[in-house]
């Protein structure tokens, strides 16, 4: 019986096409040269591998924190203004949608859109939810938690996004 053995170089060369990259949370960052030519970057050396850590840091990922007394979502939306963002609470979910129409930048024209949906814990007081956008583009959605047994109130409503003039105090991953 013959067994085909695949050299690790082939896996690295096809890396950008594997499903593990499907869930990257890119919000339309500019393309780098190696994004356009993924095969050339992996053929430099069989031991060369692009740093995934840098990719994660630059990807606009979100962070969700649920402490004893509050629930907080941090989301990097540096390419969007408060007018481009919509934050809604629908029953036990918060939906964050961002969209800006086509506009010109240094490399041509670009439009961006994203949609995020997070489940709210059942003990979050939905009447006291707040959302703000810091000067450095960090969206902070937060709400206090109520003690067990107290009705947290579940209804559909829009949460206004307020602009802060200072940079975010969110931790950098």
Swiss-Prot record:
Pfam families: Crystallin, HSP20. Keywords: Acetylation, Chaperone, Cytoplasm, Eye lens protein, Glycoprotein, Metal-binding, Methylation, Nucleus, Phosphoprotein, Zinc. Residues 52-162 form the sHSP domain. GO terms for cellular component: cytoplasm; cytosol; nucleoplasm; nucleus; protein-containing complex. InterPro entries: A-crystallin/Hsp20_dom (IPR002068), Alpha-crystallin/HSP_16 (IPR055269), Alpha-crystallin/sHSP_animal (IPR001436), Alpha-crystallin_N (IPR003090), HSP20-like_chaperone (IPR008978). The modification Phosphoserine is found at residues 45, 122. The keyword Transferase does not apply. The keyword Glycoprotein applies. The modification Deamidated glutamine is found at residues 6, 50. GO terms for biological process: actin filament organization; apoptotic process involved in morphogenesis; embryonic camera-type eye morphogenesis; lens development in camera-type eye; lens fiber cell morphogenesis; microtubule-based process; mitochondrion organization; negative regulation of apoptotic process. The modification N-acetylmethionine is found at residue 1. Glycans are attached at residue 162. Residues 144-173 are annotated as: Disordered. Zn(2+) 3 binds at residue 154. Zn(2+) 1 binds at residues 100, 102. Contributes to the transparency and refractive index of the lens. Acts as a chaperone, preventing aggregation of various proteins under a wide range of stress conditions. Required for the correct formation of lens intermediate filaments as part of a complex composed of BFSP1, BFSP2 and CRYAA. Heteromer composed of three CRYAA and one CRYAB subunits. Inter-subunit bridging via zinc ions enhances stability, which is crucial as there is no protein turn over in the lens. Can also form homodimers and homotetramers (dimers of dimers) which serve as the building blocks of homooligomers. Within homooligomers, the zinc-binding motif is created from residues of 3 different molecules. His-100 and Glu-102 from one molecule are ligands of the zinc ion, and His-107 and His-154 residues from additional molecules complete the site with tetrahedral coordination geometry. Belongs to the small heat shock protein (HSP20) family. This is Alpha-crystallin A chain. It comes from Canis lupus familiaris. The lineage of its organism: Eukaryota, Metazoa, Chordata, Craniata, Vertebrata.
């Amino acid at each position: 019986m013959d067994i085909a053995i695949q050299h690790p170089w082939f896996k690295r060369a096809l890396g950008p096409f594997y499903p593990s990259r499907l869930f990257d949370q890119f919000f339309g960052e500019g393309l780098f040269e190696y994004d356009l030519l993924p095969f050339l970057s992996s053929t430099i050396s069989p031991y060369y591998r692009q740093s995934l850590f840098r990719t994660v840091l630059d990807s606009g990922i979100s962070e969700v924190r649920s402490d004893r007394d509050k629930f907080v979502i941090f989301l990097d939306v540096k390419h969007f203004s408060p007018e481009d963002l919509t934050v809604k609470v629908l029953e036990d979910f918060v939906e964050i949608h961002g969209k800006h129409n086509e506009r010109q930048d240094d490399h041509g024209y670009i439009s961006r859109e994203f949609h995020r949906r997070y489940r709210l814990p059942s003990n979050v007081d939905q009447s006291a939810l707040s959302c703000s956008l810091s000067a450095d583009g960090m969206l902070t959605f937060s709400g206090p938690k109520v003690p067990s047994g107290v009705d947290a109130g579940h209804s559909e409503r829009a949460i206004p996004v307020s602009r802060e003039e200072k940079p975010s105090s969110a931790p950098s991953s």
